[in-house]
A protein has these predicted regions:
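Active-site pre-lysine segment of PLP-dependent enzymes
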Residues: 1-27
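PLP-dependent enzyme catalytic core of the Aspartate aminotransferase-like
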Residues: 127-131, 136, 140-172
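Alpha-helical structural signal in soluble globular domains
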Residues: 7-14, 88-96, 127, 131, ...
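Conserved PLP-binding catalytic core of the aspartate aminotransferase-like
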Residues: 82-83, 87, 96-131, 147, ...
């Protein structure tokens, strides 16, 4: 969200062992470039530079990132889209609370949906994949009952909500 300060930059400035990373994926529309940036104490950056591979980011990716930084209109459009569809999806998932779903408040381009009912996150993930929706099941992050659902296009966001509703209703 615009104006949302998570305090990460201040933490990196005040602590020598903190690395803040950001991506150009969603807000700048450069997911395919796999490019981002980091901010940290000079000692951390120096250590990273000593071990990184040469040419670890393509020239095209670098040029795209620089151009993206100049595109305030695209960023504003992305923020507005994410805010609108994040709110819509939050309400849709909240409406499935009787099926044991709980949505964690988000200021990002995704929702964390916790499965606390009959259908597990693992089962929902598999069923959504069968319906053509790739979400992220989170056991490796200690959230065996969580799915990360990214805000997509209007069609994708409505589709994943409908698919999840069908899965939960079929389970009873």
């Amino acid at each position: 969200d615009e104006g949302q300060d998570d305090g990460a930059m201040e933490l990196a400035e005040s602590q020598a062992n903190v690395l803040v990373t950001r991506t150009f994926s969603k807000i700048h529309g450069l997911a395919a470039e796999r490019i981002g940036w980091g901010y940290a104490h000079a000692d951390i950056i120096g250590a990273m530079n000593r071990i990184r591979l040469p040419f670890n980011v393509t020239t095209a990716g670098q040029q795209a990132a620089v151009a993206a930084l100049a595109s305030n209109d695209f960023v504003a459009m992305s923020r507005a889209h994410n805010a609108k569809w994040r709110q819509w999806l939050t309400e849709e998932m909240g409406g499935l609370g009787n099926h044991g779903l709980r949505v964690v408040r988000s200021h990002t381009n995704f929702l964390l949906v916790l499965f606390e009912g009959k259908v597990t996150a693992e089962q929902a993930n598999a069923a959504l994949l069968d319906k053509g929706y790739a979400v992220r099941w989170l056991p490796g992050q200690g959230l065996v009952n969580g799915l990360r659902i990214t805000i997509g296009t209007e069609e994708e966001t409505r589709g994943v909500a409908t698919a999840l509703r069908e899965i939960l209703e079929a389970a009873g």
